[in-house]
Amino acid sequence: MTYRDRPLGELAISIPRATRLFRQYELDFCCGGKLTLQRAAARHSLDLVMLESQLAELDSTPDQHRDWRQAPLDELCAFIVTRYHQRHRDQLPELVLMAQKVEQVHTGKTGCPRGLAKQLDSLRQELDSHMMKEERILFPLIEQGEGARCHGPISVMEHEHRDAGELLDVIRFLTDNMTPPTGACTTWRALYAGISELINDLMEHVSLENNLLFPRALGDV
């Protein structure tokens, strides 16, 4: 089977374990999910045949996760809220506190991520507002089958997804891609591990919405 002409977002949804592979090679399957594998590989100077081989191996391995492509939309919305929205609400306040501590204690050390707490708090505020709008406005419309009324709200949500992606780029830069310096304390290392987990969760969250929930709600798939 060839994968090169299929968009990254489609591959991320149809082969759930592909998201880990895409993160490994820094391929944006969320907001950049419309890019084909071939174009993404060329943009990042990656071996296309190697990528296709790895995807084929993943695709041939049975997956225990639910296939959300055929699930009722109300169940998909509920899953996103419980699996991702609640998780982000738990993750970000703790990460902000840890970042504040690291910046205060290690402010003079090489590699100290000065400004990280501010960026994480900005992300927290943006996501809090974003998720509330989804839960109070967009998801109820989707659950009621009001796809024709979803174009405007979905356009806003996709724009906010891109804004969140830009904040993640800043966070990656400040943390040297979540790489703690040699001799970093436990809190510092735990902070970067927590940020890595947050980014992985957020990318899966956005991919599920951009590449599956929103197109299905609009009747595009």
From Swiss-Prot:
Subunit structure: Homodimer.
Keyword Isomerase: no
Top-level taxon of origin: Bacteria
Protein function: Di-iron-containing protein involved in the repair of iron-sulfur clusters damaged by oxidative and nitrosative stress conditions.
InterPro entries cross-referenced by the UniProt entry: FeS-repair_YftE, Hemerythrin-like, RIC_family
Keyword Transferase: no
CC annotations in GO: cytoplasm
Pfam families reported in the protein's UniProt record: Hemerythrin, ScdA_N
Gene from which this protein is expressed: ytfE
Molecular function terms, GO-annotated: metal ion binding
NCBIfam families assigned to the protein according to its UniProt record, in alphabetical order: FeS_repair_RIC, PRK10992.1
Family annotation (HAMAP family): RIC_YtfE
UniProt keyword annotations, A-Z: Cytoplasm, Iron, Metal-binding, Stress response
Major subcellular site: cytoplasm
Biological process, per Gene Ontology: protein repair; response to nitrosative stress; response to oxidative stress
Identification of the protein by name: Iron-sulfur cluster repair protein YtfE
Family, per entry: Belongs to the RIC family. YtfE subfamily.
Compartments in which it is found: Cytoplasm
